[in-house]
């Protein structure tokens, strides 16, 4: 729900625990190219120090190149036993390998790191812009985003002059009264920055100001 990172120390502790307790370890590193911290590490960098660990890390092509919507192809790396089992399962369930997309991703990774970096900067700026707007309108971040393009917010106790009982209620009130659509679950709301936030800055600000939220 909110892009976060794991550093080397955290992965080392996790690998050691899983190794000692015979636990298989999988990490979905889909958003690694959209991480906004130099402390960000990957499981692949650490797991090789644990030769008996059964592990695997997955990477999504769509996110590796910035946000290539529809580029549904990925890559995995890991211990031979884990990869072997995944090959058995995926080989009997997938529709097949999309070679043109795989080739395109390789070209982007090898020849257009500047383009990928530009998307990373763009999403980071959008996250900052949206967070600033919503916080100025009284919304409360659940956690600061450190990767990806999602923001996670606590559900207000009051909005539009009435008490709010759930994130679902608040989301539907926002949709009905302002047209702003979020994703509600548990007691949180998620808002993405996949569109040009600056272009809709005024509309977003007006929407959340009209909500008159409080906690």
Question: Language-model segments: which ranges?
Answer:
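Helix C-cap/helix->beta junction micro-motif
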Residues: 20-21, 137, 178
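Conserved core segment of the aminotransferase class I/II
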Residues: 48-124, 128-134, 213
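PLP-dependent enzyme catalytic core of the Aspartate aminotransferase-like
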Residues: 163, 172-215
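Active-site phosphate-binding strand-loop segment of PLP-dependent enzymes
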Residues: 1-40
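A generic structural signal for well-ordered alpha-helical segments
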Residues: 18, 134, 174-175
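Hydrophobic residues in well-ordered beta-strands that form the structural core
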Residues: 27, 57, 182-184
